[in-house]
Amino acid sequence: MNFVTTLTYLLPHRMLSSLARHVAYCQHPLIKQWLIDTVIAKFDVNLSEAAEPDAHAYPSFNAFFTRSLKTGIRLPDPNPDTLLMPADGRISQLGPIREGRIFQAKGQSFTATELLGDTAAAAAFTNGLFATVYLSPRDYHRVHMPCTGQLLKTVHVPGRLFSVGPDAVRQIPRLFARNERLACHFDTAFGPMVLVMVGALLVSGVETVWGGVEIPAYGDRITHKDYQGRNIAIERFAEMARFNYGSTVIVLLPPNVFTLAPHLTAESPVTLGQALAHRLSLNHSTQAPTQEK
């Protein structure tokens, strides 16, 4: 484990993230502009794709970070049987959920039950598929629906706020099952689907289109919110949630319904709306994709 990763164990995660939250919403022109300009330069942010390409037009760093894209700059795969990539970013890992376990990195895994904080819900994804997408600070930070879904419930699982960068993913055991996260459960035409919004160091919040800010500043217990009967349906490719700083979204899919797009591997750069998975025909046998070992 390198020095930086070791240091993340010792850092006051909550205090730093609380400070980041306040700074992100600061509208002092010198402070917010310095932050925006620094991130653009350090991470090579492409503002030409943004609905507002003028870096000075954003009232706060958070407004810049959660910026919208120009209409038409991302388009959904036209095949209705294709599951869409939910975000811009890079594939951290993807593949089958073997015996209830989700692959994180070489020698690292965690269970779907640990991730979701719900044994019964996790059972629906045994031998299913997962895809973990990392959103770096340069990326578009809104998460969209892979397919049309009816919101059933959300589960906020409190936890640590480790970095979710590539080094941390390789070196911190069960990282995504330890960090604070919001699991959003949907009913879809092909069965259950969960999108897990994973918090991280300096992430100042997760917002959903139906509930606003969903991750409390100091949550200390698992919180369930039941949305059945509320008729909250979100269309394929529509915005579902957003990160107020870079982090990770994990998609869980049930077994025997989809096959992952064959060109996708760990570290593949991805864009919102491209194919994540293709629906299997009724007479198609499921073949598990290969994972990094």
Swiss-Prot record:
Pyruvic acid (Ser) modifications at: 247
User: How is it placed in the membrane, per its record?
Assistant: Peripheral membrane protein
What biological-process GO terms show up in the record?
Answer: phosphatidylethanolamine biosynthetic process
Query: What detail does the entry give on cofactor binding?
Result: Binds 1 pyruvoyl group covalently per subunit.
Q: Active-site residues?
A: 88 (charge relay system), 144 (charge relay system), 247 (charge relay system), 247 (schiff-base intermediate with substrate)
Tell me the route in metabolism or biology where this protein functions: Phospholipid metabolism; phosphatidylethanolamine biosynthesis; phosphatidylethanolamine from CDP-diacylglycerol: step 2/2
Signal peptide residues are none
Pfam families reported in the protein's UniProt record: PS_Dcarbxylase
Q: Which cofactor does it need?
A: pyruvate
| Record InterPro entries | PS_Dcarbxylase (IPR003817), PSD-B (IPR033177), PSD_type1_pro (IPR033178)
Q: What EC designation does it have?
A: 4.1.1.65
Ordered alphabetically, the record's keywords are: Cell membrane, Decarboxylase, Lipid biosynthesis, Lipid metabolism, Lyase, Membrane, Phospholipid biosynthesis, Phospholipid metabolism, Pyruvate, Zymogen
Subcellular location(s) per record: Cell membrane
Source organism's superkingdom?
Bacteria
**What catalytic activity does the UniProt entry give for this protein?**
a 1,2-diacyl-sn-glycero-3-phospho-L-serine + H(+) = a 1,2-diacyl-sn-glycero-3-phosphoethanolamine + CO2
User: What's its job?
Assistant: Catalyzes the formation of phosphatidylethanolamine (PtdEtn) from phosphatidylserine (PtdSer).
Q: How does it assemble?
A: Heterodimer of a large membrane-associated beta subunit and a small pyruvoyl-containing alpha subunit.
UniProt name for this protein: Phosphatidylserine decarboxylase proenzyme
